[in-house]
Amino acid sequence: MARITVEDCLEQIPNRFQLVLAATYRARMLSQGHAPKIESRNKPAVTALREIAAGKVGLEMLKKVPG
């Protein structure tokens, strides 16, 4: 499987800071047992970035963070 790059993810979420926040939150969800939206055998952080690059997860992750 090809490596995931930040540039792949920036096509979906252009702001690097929002990208980091969304990926972090999604990786935490995956590590707590949520089902991945893509098929992946990688660690939660890589799976989260792959989901973002594929357009399966986006900035809506930031709206789910309790405030």
From Swiss-Prot:
Family of this protein: Belongs to the RNA polymerase subunit omega family.
InterPro entries xrefs: DNA-dir_RNA_pol_omega, Pol_omega/Rpo6/RPB6, RPB6/omega-like_sf
Pfam families named among the record's database cross-references: RNA_pol_Rpb6
Encoding gene (name): rpoZ
Description of how the protein assembles with itself and partners: The RNAP catalytic core consists of 2 alpha, 1 beta, 1 beta' and 1 omega subunit. When a sigma factor is associated with the core the holoenzyme is formed, which can initiate transcription.
Nucleotidyltransferase is among the record's keywords: yes
Biological role: Promotes RNA polymerase assembly. Latches the N- and C-terminal regions of the beta' subunit thereby facilitating its interaction with the beta and alpha subunits.
Catalytic activity line of the entry: RNA(n) + a ribonucleoside 5'-triphosphate = RNA(n+1) + diphosphate
GO aspect biological process, one term: DNA-templated transcription
Keywords: DNA-directed RNA polymerase, Nucleotidyltransferase, Transcription, Transferase
Superkingdom: Bacteria
GO MF annotations in UniProt: DNA binding; DNA-directed RNA polymerase activity
Provenance organism: Acidovorax ebreus (strain TPSY)
EC number(s) recorded for this UniProt protein: 2.7.7.6
Any one Gene Ontology cellular component term annotated for this protein: DNA-directed RNA polymerase complex
Name of the protein this chain belongs to: DNA-directed RNA polymerase subunit omega
